[in-house]
């Protein structure tokens, strides 16, 4: 096991090195080049206090807030404030003198008791996934807008099948049967984070982004890959799985990763012992994926979110070779394997720029503005189910968000331009997004 700040590796690209082993000052500069990128699952694990146990069920984090009593405790201050406001509105005669509920007129007393009972029943019936974020937790551009109605997927949509080497072939047999009808597929990957940072002279900012992605994809191995299938309207099969989480063979003792990343991944629910013994061989996975009917077919629509790393790991697996030296060759390979795909991050960014034209004018604001998948899901009214924090759940959330956004917008941007204009464009790699 190796910390990412102790022994940087050396990778030559165009005569330059990705890491310098010469001086400690250069290592310090590399540490300040940018924050390490983590997946949503790892980011959630970073929020856990040290020493707090994390319960997992079927590889997903089991949130303990399903307990109605804990949920009531969490919302009790807000509920008390609402009750006080209601009492003030319903008690115009109470000026300066506190009046107990027992001393109120009979009709008002019964009304208040009924309202309190209804509020308590609603609080008890609400699960964790149906809780909307508080106003203080929302982005600024959402605080002044009315919340959309909740889009509640059917229960069978929220099932994620864990795939190990023991059931790899049987699950791909299911995928082959579904592809002809459910030809929209989303992908999400889990890896240890960005450890490599290129140094040297680059042709552009886009070239730097590609070389960073290229270094990390060549350097690291994926831990999990999520796939989810639906039709163009977001419909899924009534019976059986339509979202899968593929668990690859991964031995932390042989991989390059920091101690911090290892602990965060363990907290997020990754069972490295099981990955080491029961994990899927990535090249066996690539052969089955090529025969699944998903690849090299323009009738299949791929959905990603900030696609660079997801597509990078997938192309690296399918090629069984090092990443291409330049982004043009990489894009060629992507379009060969996936001729029809959308980067939902780019689509969401363009929609937000139509809503806030000043974002297009200020490059500094563009860098500060974050367009996360969770924020998009909140705007679309998708509840925050705990399954969405897993790798397979992330692919499911991408697919649900894209299909819901397409239905609400009729697959068009606010100016009437069709989403197809940005088909096959990778956010951060193609152009200066």
Curated annotation (Swiss-Prot):
The lineage of its organism: Eukaryota, Fungi, Dikarya, Ascomycota, Saccharomycotina. GO terms for cellular component: CCR4-NOT core complex; cytoplasm; mating projection tip; nucleus; P-body. Transmembrane segments: none annotated. It is an enzyme of class 3 (hydrolase). GO terms for biological process: nuclear-transcribed mRNA catabolic process, deadenylation-dependent decay; nuclear-transcribed mRNA poly(A) tail shortening; positive regulation of transcription elongation by RNA polymerase II; transcription elongation by RNA polymerase II. Acts as a probably catalytic component of the CCR4-NOT core complex, which in the nucleus seems to be a general transcription factor, and in the cytoplasm the major mRNA deadenylase involved in mRNA turnover. In vitro, POP2 has 3'-exoribonuclease activity with a preference for poly(A) RNAs, but also degrades poly(U) and poly(C) RNAs. Is part of a glucose-sensing system involved in growth control in response to glucose availability. Its cofactor is Mg(2+). It comes from Saccharomyces cerevisiae (strain ATCC 204508 / S288c) (Baker's yeast). The modification Phosphothreonine is found at residue 97. Residues 81-91 have a biased composition (Low complexity). Pfam families: CAF1. Subunit of the 1.0 MDa CCR4-NOT core complex that contains CCR4, CAF1, NOT1, NOT2, NOT3, NOT4, NOT5, CAF40 and CAF130. In the complex interacts with NOT1. The core complex probably is part of a less characterized 1.9 MDa CCR4-NOT complex. The keyword NADP does not apply. Its main location: cytoplasm. Keywords: Acetylation, Activator, Cytoplasm, Exonuclease, Hydrolase, Magnesium, Metal-binding, Nuclease, Nucleus, Phosphoprotein, Repressor, RNA-binding, Transcription, Transcription regulation. Present with 1520 molecules/cell in log phase SD medium. One of its GO terms (molecular function) is 3'-5'-RNA exonuclease activity. The modification N-acetylmethionine is found at residue 1. This is Poly(A) ribonuclease POP2.
């Amino acid at each position: 096991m190796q910390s990412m700040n102790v022994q940087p590796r050396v990778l030559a690209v165009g005569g330059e090195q990705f890491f310098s082993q010469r001086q400690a000052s250069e290592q310090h500069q590399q540490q300040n080049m940018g924050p390490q990128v983590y997946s949503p699952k790892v980011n959630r694990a970073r929020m856990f206090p040290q020493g707090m146990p994390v319960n997992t069920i079927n590889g997903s984090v089991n949130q303990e807030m399903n307990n109605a009593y804990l949920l009531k405790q969490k919302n009790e201050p807000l509920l008390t404030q609402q009750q006080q406001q209601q009492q003030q509105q319903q008690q115009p005669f109470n000026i300066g003198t506190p009046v107990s509920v027992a001393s109120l007129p009979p009709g008002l007393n019964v009304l208040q008791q009924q309202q309190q009972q209804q509020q308590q029943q609603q609080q008890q019936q609400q699960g964790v996934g149906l809780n909307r974020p508080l106003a203080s937790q929302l982005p600024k551009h959402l605080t002044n807008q009315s919340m959309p109605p909740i889009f509640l997927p059917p229960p069978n949509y929220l099932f994620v099948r864990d795939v190990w080497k023991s059931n790899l072939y049987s699950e791909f047999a299911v995928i082959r049967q579904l592809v002809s009808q459910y030809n929209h597929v989303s992908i999400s990957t889990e890896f240890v984070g960005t450890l490599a940072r290129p140094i040297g002279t680059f042709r552009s900012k886009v070239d730097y982004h590609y070389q960073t992605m290229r270094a990390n994809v060549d350097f690291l191995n994926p831990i999990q890959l999520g796939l989810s299938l639906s039709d163009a309207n977001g419909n899924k099969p009534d019976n059986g799985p339509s979202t899968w989480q593929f668990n690859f063979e991964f031995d932390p003792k042989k991989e390059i990763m920091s101690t911090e990343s290892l602990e965060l991944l363990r907290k997020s629910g990754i069972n490295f012992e099981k990955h080491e013994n029961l994990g899927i061989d990535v090249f066996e996975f690539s052969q089955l994926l090529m025969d699944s009917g998903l690849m090299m077919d323009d009738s299949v629509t791929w959905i990603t979110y900030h696609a660079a790393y997801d597509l990078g790991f997938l192309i690296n697996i399918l090629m069984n070779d090092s990443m291409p030296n330049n982004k043009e060759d990489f894009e060629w390979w992507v379009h060969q394997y996936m001729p029809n795909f959308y980067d939902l991050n780019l689509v969401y960014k363009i929609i937000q720029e139509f809503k806030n034209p000043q974002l297009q004018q200020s490059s500094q604001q563009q860098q500060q503005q974050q367009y996360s998948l969770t924020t998009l899901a909140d705007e679309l009214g998708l509840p925050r189910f705990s399954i969405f924090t897993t790798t397979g759940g992330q692919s499911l959330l991408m697919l649900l968000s894209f299909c819901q956004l397409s239905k609400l917008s009729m697959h068009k941007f606010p100016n009437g331009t069709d989403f197809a204009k940005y088909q096959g464009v990778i956010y951060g790699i193609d152009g200066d997004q």
